[in-house]
Amino acid sequence: MKLHELSPSEGSRKKRKRVGRGPGSGMGGTSTRGNKGHNQRSGGGTRPGFEGGQMPLHRRLPKRGFKNILAKSILIVNLSDLDRFEDKAVIDVAALKQTGLIKGMFDKVKILGDGEVSKAFTFKQCLVSKTARQKIEAAGGSIEL
């Protein structure tokens, strides 16, 4: 068997429907769109979620909640993520961004106590949870606000 002798299995390669290419094709004339009306026109048809005039689901369901524009977005970093830093490293927002631990828009960064710390880090400009503070200080690190 050679490469040029290979052919796809029967029915695996379906031909596309070429509409509007003459009456002999069986799809000429109205091009499978029917006679006149909104759905025959260019740009015709219904929008996604249209239910035939029935009140659509997104309008039947009640509105809930609101977006608080004063809310502060706080990104979370766990102690287990900080192993990549060297001993006695100063960890601040810029250092976390540089290593790829935090991305995007945010107001503050908070260090949480999930994981263990074996190195003495100095944290700057970070919020720190109680358990994280205990683990950092036990490892000989410090926190500067």
From Swiss-Prot:
Start-end of Gly residues biased regions: 21-31, 42-52
Keywords: Ribonucleoprotein, Ribosomal protein, RNA-binding, rRNA-binding
SUPFAM superfamilies (UniProt xref): Ribosomal proteins L15p and L18e (SSF52080)
Gene Ontology annotations for the cellular component aspect, listed alphabetically: cytosolic large ribosomal subunit
Function: Binds to the 23S rRNA.
Family: Belongs to the universal ribosomal protein uL15 family.
A single MF term (Gene Ontology): rRNA binding
HAMAP family assigned to the protein according to its UniProt record, in alphabetical order: Ribosomal_uL15
Keyword Heme: no
NCBIfam families, A to Z: rplO_bact
Presence of the UniProt keyword RNA-binding in the record: yes
Disulfide bonds: none
Assembly description: Part of the 50S ribosomal subunit.
Stored Pfam families: Ribosomal_L27A
Transmembrane segments: none
Record GO biological process: translation
Gene3D superfamilies: 3.100.10.10
Region annotation (Disordered) ranges: 1-58
InterPro entries named among the record's database cross-references: Ribosomal_uL15 (IPR030878), Ribosomal_uL15/eL18 (IPR021131), Ribosomal_uL15/eL18_sf (IPR036227), Ribosomal_uL15_bac-type (IPR005749), Ribosomal_uL15_CS (IPR001196)
Entry protein name: Large ribosomal subunit protein uL15
